[in-house]
């Protein structure tokens, strides 16, 4: 929009919040989507608020809130504080300085979509607003407009079929197993082997092990029989070392076999297949040959090759199965938002404050698909 600052793009994740100005390749700010309040304050005292990494570091002294859980906003007041923090402390901008594009999960409840628009227009005072599905933006970032996006972050894993930029909601599948669950599972596996990393502060260490040492086995049963000489030595922050082996492929296996974390649901291979089979017959081959990975929990080495193998077993004979694993998939949702909000052809898509005032919050259902 002319006369304004470049649009702000906010990717609202269960684990991390990513924010920055459209037109840049990476978000300028990425930090945990958590809010901390000082304990023991009274109604008359000024309450100390910490967000992101600062809240993580001081969490033993704070009451911690997670504004987004399982992909959905669970505390609207805290979410608004996080959004205001982005403008006031990260970007040093007034919300009225320019448009904002906010991401949302597939199947976001209608009431939540309306509420988000109300907060940005009525409370923050943005001049223009748009909301876009995370999977659609990840697909755009990969250079496609049609494909099946497997998006897995901290809170949820979703399979989303997209045709020419439009989410086919009848084919969306969701699994409530994602990064946070895998971290908890790895803590349990380590405990079973006598490696006690169970304190709240240890979670960061276990997350680091998960992100830098875990991998997906091509064949889970075969991997179980391999020699322990495949052990990895991991150095803990206190200088002690631990030997890791089977935990490293046990952990991400829960994405393929959710029963490992006590969730009765199909794994990601069956999710992808089921999602595709919900779609029109003429579109299925396009989806089988364009499965796009997105989100940090799809970054395990070997996940893409294992997914090809397992989906191919389920697919009709002679079906070409291709999985595309963009190297930047941890931030691809935000990147897609940055690209979209910068396109000259997109500028007529913004919902303006005047339009919102005239039509009301229902306008998001008419304009944001």
Curated annotation (Swiss-Prot):
Matches recorded under CDD domains: ASKHA_NBD_actin_Arp-T1-3
Keyword Nucleus included in the entry's annotation: yes
Record-linked Pfam families: Actin
Keywords assigned: Cytoplasm, Cytoskeleton, Nucleus
This protein's GO CC annotations: cytoplasm; cytoskeleton; male germ cell nucleus
Subcellular location per the Swiss-Prot or TrEMBL entry: Cytoplasm, Cytoskeleton; Cytoplasm; Nucleus
Tissue/organ expression: Testis specific (at protein level). Expressed specifically in haploid germ cells.
PANTHER family: ACTIN
Subunit relationships: Interacts with PFN3.
Entry's family note: Belongs to the actin family.
Protein name in the entry: Actin-related protein T3
